[in-house]
Amino acid sequence: MSWDDGKHTKVKRVQLTFDDVIRSIEVEYDGTSLKSQPRGTAGTKIDGFTLSSDEYITEVNGYYKTTFSGEVITSLTFKTNKRTYGTYGNKTSSYFSVAAPKDNQIVGFLGSSSHALNSIDAHFAPAPPPGSTGAKPGASGIGSDSGSIGSAGTNPGADGTRETEKNAGGSKPSSGSAGTNPGASAVGNGETEKNAGGSKPSSGSAGTNPGASAGGNGETEKNVGGSKPSSGKAGTNPGANAGGNGGTEKNAGGSKSSSGSARTNPGASAGGNGETVSNIGDTESNAGGSKSNDGANNGASGIESNAGSTGTNFGAGGTGGIGDTESDAGGSKTNSGNGGTNDGASGIGSNDGSTGTNPGAGGGTDSNIEGTENNVGGKETNPGASGIGNSDGSTGTSPEGTESNADGTKTNTGGKESNTGSESNTNSSPQKLEAQGGNGGNQWDDGTDHDGVMKIHVAVGGLGIEQIRFDYVKNGQLKEGPFHGVKGRGGTSTIEISHPDEYLVSVEGLYDSSNIIQGIQFQSNKHTSQYFGYEYYGDGTQFSLQVNEKKIIGFHGFADSHLNSLGAYFVPISSSSSSLTPPPNKVKAQGGSYGETFDDGAFDHVRKVYVGQGDSGVAYVKFDYEKDGKKETQEHGKMTLSGTEEFEVDSDDYITSMEVYVDKVYGYKSEIVIALTFKTFKGETSPRFGIETENKYEVKDGKGGKLAGFHGKASDVLYAIGAYFIPAAN
């Protein structure tokens, strides 16, 4: 059944029910007293979000699948001008997106539903200017193609209507053209320009067809993740099954030959008579190849040959020293030359993790981690000193797991990898933390000739982080960096850092078996960015880039069609910055791993706490913060009929710690928060909001700081909660 909420001032609240698919959506709007009807039927899980007065939705995307009764949406993610909500539901193979045009917002939804949500689209209106709230209802996303269900275009006409360029879950009419048609069945003689996740018409051409089955004699220009037509030509086909007689021009993302030759049909199965016209990446970073270092390293920087690529060793010392071969992913190292002289000491390294010899100095451990060589420590010129650590002098730690590098084998028994910088490198050169993430992609390096990071531009797509760019500052001048990855149809979000008072201190992220970074978040000494991409629900590996008392001045990593991995360069916070606001101390959240991540960041004060109880534990929390004299409120979880209990902090007092009671409750996918208690500097203790359990954790920073903000995970209940702490003098 088709439905249409119409156009309103702005979206106020969205509530979803779901299980294996999205069962229903219900939306509240500003500018009307009427509440939207639930569109669909009730699911087993309920979740949603409420927008602040100056927040508006700019995009909705998700996944769908085809069942015996037609297409159904399996997941939804909502992007606003401030953050991302979701993913709600389950990611499947077919992706779609409905994005508002530039400087517009979504002001209403329409679509179709039955036992589940079958399709969804949006009405658009101009976004309010900065500093204002509300907007005038504007053009609709309803297309002029009556054969489509839930269409959104990008070509608004003067009368507020638009051509059909996106058709999520609908069917294409027998004649005419459709633009981007995710999930549609394109039949007849009409020309399908873009058909994401649908089937190709028997005649005509298909343009960009991610996940589609392109059959017939039409020419497929781009087929991302789909199958190649039996005849015709395939253009860029990353990860596709390229069969038949068509020639494959570019296939990105597969295996690389060890001899230094370019990738041959990476990630694809090239069958039939297809001719490989172009292979992307001509021996880049020697992924899977062999590495040789046959020359001598005479105590200075060396040049190494990675099966066709050239690397530079910046550190002094013999073979196996600090600057020798920082990263060789998937390859094997052969050192057939002797080390040069370094104050009379010679060092001969090998790829088995043996220790070189250095009279009067401690030899470094040369460790080959899963084919990736990290020179752990290096040749020291300080007699009697032992250099054991990472190539940059830091010691990697894994708070949620154990990481052992001593024998050349990497073991990570937890879900998170962290480089937090226990410093042993005292020189002034930038400290390099190796790239974290998946394998593959082309190596890039923005370098270190910067004073800091000014802007970060992030584009997120259906498979993870598509593209990233960093703008740096040098001597007060902005230096725009290059793009890494390829931007899709979605928008780009920008983080601005107010140099020099503000500087970047850490990055947290998530990657999985797709070898693509799935989500990422940045923290400065003053703020924490929104979380970009997919949340952590127990699958994949979390990582962190951070060095104590240092700031980030540059990035490096690997990227191709997406961002595969990310590393960073750190330098000490300068004396001129030492008097600036130190970064807040983010103390780990206690509780379970399920739920949507929230991160309020750090404020000047926490003025009031609201806690709402549910049937099994804490279902809802709300916090009144103060920043620069202005009040800001954040809420998480789902309010119940029980209402809330409150704890107000006096103006001359502050919270110093929080007790979190957690337990495993039947019906929930992980532990949940059962109760909370707060304590203040003046000795006040809040009531215990909830029921006491045996599993109690105290959240505090151990430095006498004051609690200045919260982070954690929530959906219909509060799954986990942690806090930010700042010096009490603030």
Curated annotation (Swiss-Prot):
Instruction: Give the start-end ranges of region Disordered.
Output: 121-450
Keywords (alphabetical) are: Lectin, Repeat
Domain Jacalin-type lectin: residue ranges:
1-126, 430-572, 584-727
Q: Does the keyword Transferase apply?
A: no
- Tell whether Mitochondrion is among the UniProt keywords: no
Ranges of biased composition (kind: Low complexity): 138-153, 168-179, 196-207, 248-261, 343-358, 417-429
Q: Which domain of life is it from?
A: Eukaryota
Composition-biased stretches, type Polar residues, lie in 275-307, 366-375, 388-416
Q: Which residues form a coiled coil?
A: none
Q: Please provide one cellular component term from the Gene Ontology annotations of this protein.
A: nucleus
Q: Do you know which Pfam families this protein is assigned to?
A: Jacalin
The GO terms this record gives for MF are: carbohydrate binding
List the biased-composition ranges (Gly residues).
Answer: 314-323
Per its UniProt record, what InterPro entries does this chain match?
Answer: Jacalin-like_lectin_dom (IPR001229), Jacalin-like_lectin_dom_plant (IPR033734), Jacalin-like_lectin_dom_sf (IPR036404)
The record's family statement is: Belongs to the jacalin lectin family.
Could you identify this protein by its name?
Jacalin-related lectin 5
